[in-house]
Amino acid sequence: IRDSSDEAIANGLPNLLISYHETQADAENNLFPITEEYDNIVAYQQTIYVRVEDTTITTDCFSYVELLLVVNDVPQINPDSSSLEVCDDDTDGFGLFDLSLSNEEVLNGLDPSEFTITYYENAENAENAENPIITPFAYTNITAFNQTVWVRVENNATECYNTSSIELTVNELPVLTQPDPLNLCDYNNPG
């Protein structure tokens, strides 16, 4: 809360002492400031109070403002790894995948119009929304035969997100041997 809220509340003014309190009375009396990370005690929406003092004034002059904390759920996507498989047509361990084929399974019943789905080659990039896979509809794996890619599902309204993984598998084609010619006897003479 503190860093982003402090800047917005101070609005560029210097020499301000800003403290956060659970109740209006605590803010007015400068009691029980919130000094650590704060876990809301009222689900989804809670008002806390921000006390602001000018450190250059020797008298106890202060103002306070209400700050509404809004907690949004993260998307409840499918936590189990999805998988996509293709055949290794040229026996090199690489194949072309349409990652979007996993969208429905990953969304786990969520409305696709409310979420943005992006894919990444590692978990860190998925968490930070950095370096997405540019062509998820035509992605060639970068690790032969088996590779994990990560999917990030972000709520368009709240920007809350969740991640999961997808296993890509390139299946080797069966090795065939040329059979010997099959000789049959034509007992009925049809040819």
What positions do the PLM features span?
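Extracellular low-complexity Ser/Thr/Asn/Gly-rich intrinsically disordered segments
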Residues: I1-G191
